[in-house]
């Protein structure tokens, strides 16, 4: 994604402390990429685990000064299916909140079903993609909300 003036875009980041050897690096990459893109990260909130994100994300989405939320986490496969439950339920609730508030909540959560080594390999990709997706969605939602579709046709928003 090319660097543009995105100074009017304000993000919140919610990051899991579980697997913090991975998520701390994800946070560093996300903050660097947001700076590169010229967007403002208004707040970073750490939560115990990915499953705990929804309540904080909801509070951020209520705030007028937050345009979107980036979530960062790593759900590593264990001996049970716990990772599947955590990842699936977290993703579902985050999507529900995004739709409810009409603001992007991007999924920078690695997993389920990944090993620690696989998660490490995905740190940069997931972090940067989550920030880029938030920025793109915020810009496109803004354009969509400004268009008077009673007067315009064949509109393409990119």
From Swiss-Prot:
Cite the binding residues for (2S)-2-hydroxy-3-oxobutyl phosphate: 79-80, 122
Per the record, the pathway is: Cofactor biosynthesis; riboflavin biosynthesis; riboflavin from 2-hydroxy-3-oxobutyl phosphate and 5-amino-6-(D-ribitylamino)uracil: step 1/2
| UniProtKB keywords | Riboflavin biosynthesis, Transferase
Q: Which GO terms describe its biological process?
A: riboflavin biosynthetic process
Q: Name one GO molecular function term.
A: 6,7-dimethyl-8-ribityllumazine synthase activity
Pfam families referenced in this protein's UniProt entry, alphabetically? DMRL_synthase
Q: Which InterPro entries match?
A: LS, LS/RS, LS/RS_sf
What the record says about family reads: Belongs to the DMRL synthase family.
Q: What is this protein called?
A: 6,7-dimethyl-8-ribityllumazine synthase
